């Protein structure tokens, strides 16, 4: 089922949000020269929470689908989407390019945020498809 595989992939992909945000939060709290402006703390915390819960959700999607899990996925994607929209807003208010030497500048950060936003929107859309709802015994 291609739609389900896409949901699993995107949910797993969001685990990378914990890696990046964890590093950037560490830089902020250690006052590293590459640390983000303080406006980024809330989006980073949101990313970290979404990221660390992603792999748990992937496991349950594969092993224990249920109507409750469907609701959790919908909520999780909505919270993740809200966090990303906030981060996009912050990216304009307080631009941040952590590692420009490798091309990870303000534009790259904003592009990644927009990509992840589109991915989360696609999952929310797919969660309302009949075959996906049937899979979750909805």
Where do the PLM segments sit?
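Cytosolic juxtamembrane helix at the C-terminal end of the final transmembrane segment
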Residues: 61-68, 124-138
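Aromatic-anchored segments of alpha-helical transmembrane domains
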Residues: 16-22, 76-87
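Hydrophobic transmembrane helix segments
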Residues: 13-49
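Cytosolic juxtamembrane helix and N-cap/initiation of the first transmembrane helix
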Residues: 1-19, 130-131, 135-138
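Hydrophobic cores of alpha-helical transmembrane segments in multi-pass inner/ER membrane proteins
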Residues: 49-56, 114-127
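Interfacial non-cytosolic loop connecting adjacent transmembrane helices
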Residues: 28-42, 86-112
């Amino acid at each position: 089922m291609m739609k389900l595989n896409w949901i699993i992939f995107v949910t797993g992909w969001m685990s990378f949000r914990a890696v990046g945000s964890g590093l950037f939060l560490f830089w902020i709290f250690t006052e590293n020269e590459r640390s983000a402006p303080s406006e980024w703390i809330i989006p980073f915390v949101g990313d970290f929470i979404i990221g660390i819960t992603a792999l748990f959700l992937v496991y349950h999607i594969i092993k224990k689908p249920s109507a409750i899990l469907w609701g959790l996925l919908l909520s999780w994607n909505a919270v993740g989407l809200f966090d990303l929209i906030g981060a996009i807003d912050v990216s304009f208010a307080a631009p941040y390019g952590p590692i420009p030497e490798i091309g990870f500048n303000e534009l790259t950060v904003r592009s990644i945020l927009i990509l992840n936003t589109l991915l989360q929107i696609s999952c929310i859309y797919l969660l309302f498809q009949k075959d996906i709802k049937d899979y979750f015994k909805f």
